[in-house]
Amino acid sequence: MASKVVTGVVKTTAGGVVPVSQKYTVQSVGVWERIRRAFAIDPNRSNGVPLVPYNRNPSPGSLDPLAYDDPVTIPAGDIADNPYWKRDARRNYPRLSVVGQAEAVALLSVGSASHPRVELVGENGSKQLVAAQEAGKTGGLAKYFEGTGVEAGKLVLAETGGLPPLPSGEKLGEGGKWDVYKYQLAEEPSYSEAYPCRSFS
């Protein structure tokens, strides 16, 4: 048996052509096969489309769809309260925080985390915050400064010290105040003396 297989392989590699009828491909039949062989450059060349019942394992329709258990990964596979934008790691980049006029009016009137107003703690503070945001949406900062311009200016100067906002790279100092990060020269330079370049850390 093995010798016959080897002999067939040798004949094929030696120049013997396998006829189309022995190939496991879908071919035309009847008059269409004669037309194809008449116009084909190589009549023994198949079209390459495999016979589905013989060259598909498992064959189509052989598996019971109810017998297949779809693997579910938690929490990615849980569709309840799991939208794609929450688990999209590719677009999960830092976004800029924007403070509108309504939020600015609420911060000036109610207070912030750094300078909270003690009298507006609890439910009264939450109600006052909602009212301040609604007032900021309708009137904006201009309307707020018309009524309490001097007090708002004093509050802003007390929080910032009369200076503009600090640039990025600020850190909390030892005294509890925000300070810009101090750059220091590295003790071991990353470049040799042939390339005089200072490294900061």
UniProtKB/Swiss-Prot annotation:
Transmembrane segments: none annotated. GO terms for molecular function: NADH dehydrogenase (ubiquinone) activity. Complex I is composed of about 40 different subunits. Transfer of electrons from NADH to the respiratory chain. The immediate electron acceptor for the enzyme is believed to be ubiquinone. It comes from Neurospora crassa (strain ATCC 24698 / 74-OR23-1A / CBS 708.71 / DSM 1257 / FGSC 987). GO terms for cellular component: mitochondrial inner membrane. The keyword Kinase does not apply. It is an enzyme of class 7 (translocase). Its EC number is 7.1.1.2. Keywords: Membrane, Mitochondrion, Mitochondrion inner membrane, NAD, Oxidoreductase, Translocase, Ubiquinone. It catalyses: a ubiquinone + NADH + 5 H(+)(in) = a ubiquinol + NAD(+) + 4 H(+)(out). PANTHER family: OXIDOREDUCTASE 21 KDA SUBUNIT, PUTATIVE (AFU_ORTHOLOGUE AFUA_4G05910)-RELATED. InterPro entries: NADH_Ub_cplx-1_21kDa (IPR016813). It is found in: Mitochondrion inner membrane. This is NADH-ubiquinone oxidoreductase 21.3 kDa subunit.
